[in-house]
Amino acid sequence: MAHRIIAQNRGKGGPTYRAPSHRYKAALRHAGKNDALVSGNVIDIEHDPARHAPIALARLDSGEKIYVLATEGLGVGDTVSWGTGGTVKNGNTLPLGEIPVGAYVCNIEARPNDGGKFVRSSGVQALVIGKADDGRVGIRMPSGKNKWFNGACMATVGIVAGGGRGEKPFVKAGKKHFHVRSSSERWPRVKGVCMNVIDHPFGGGGHQHCGRPKTVARGTSPGRKVGHVAARRTGKWKK
């Protein structure tokens, strides 16, 4: 009798596929709200297993310590601020309505005071491209799409640190192994046609093709539901 395929194992949610959130340092949020001004000093730059971008440990004027997303050029000893009335400089967080057109921003809030949702990956940035009469601010996202935000949403001035991370090749399989192991990702990924017949519906047969139609119905039982699920059409488009 065949055992469960990888897709079924993944759906169970065991420790092999579960994100190691117990190793994450903190949920990164803006230190202040958009109706006040909070400032502090950067006391350390650290690595967080939850992300590829480095994070900064800041001590606020109140004595509280908080982790925030680091931007390029931010260093230990720098003074940063969050909230309305701050200076437009690298690392400071202000409402979008106070940031001039043409500035690079990151860690943008989707709604006012939600802590930051967009543009948080290493090396990415968005661009302030315009402001509307109703208070909205136009942002060009890293994808190239233009998106409008509430002018009260806060964003950090600058580019997320850690750019160019993907340019260095792994070279050796061992380095790739430890890289994916840190995020509980299954690696390497083996094609179904390369597996034994017990491991996948496309496996076995001593050949490198599935040997059956790849289209399966929406209501197909688990373990057989692989390939083109409920496909309207298959194959290449004719020019």
Swiss-Prot record:
InterPro entries, A to Z: NA-bd_OB-fold, Rib_uL2_dom2, Ribosomal_uL2, Ribosomal_uL2_arc_euk, Ribosomal_uL2_C, Ribosomal_uL2_dom3, Ribosomal_uL2_RNA-bd_dom, Translation_prot_SH3-like_sf
Region (Disordered): 205-224
Domain of life from the UniProt record: Archaea
Gene (name only): rpl2
Homology family: Belongs to the universal ribosomal protein uL2 family.
Subunit structure and binding partners: Part of the 50S ribosomal subunit. Forms a bridge to the 30S subunit in the 70S ribosome.
Gene Ontology biological process terms in this record: cytoplasmic translation
Transmembrane helix listed as a keyword: no
One protein family per Pfam: Ribosomal_L2_C
Biological role: One of the primary rRNA binding proteins. Required for association of the 30S and 50S subunits to form the 70S ribosome, for tRNA binding and peptide bond formation. It has been suggested to have peptidyltransferase activity; this is somewhat controversial. Makes several contacts with the 16S rRNA in the 70S ribosome.
Keywords: Ribonucleoprotein, Ribosomal protein, RNA-binding, rRNA-binding
Species of the source: Methanoculleus marisnigri (strain ATCC 35101 / DSM 1498 / JR1)
Gene3D superfamilies the UniProt entry points to: 2.30.30.30, Nucleic acid-binding proteins, Ribosomal protein L2, domain 3
GO terms for cellular component: cytosolic large ribosomal subunit
Protein name: Large ribosomal subunit protein uL2
MF GO annotations: rRNA binding; structural constituent of ribosome
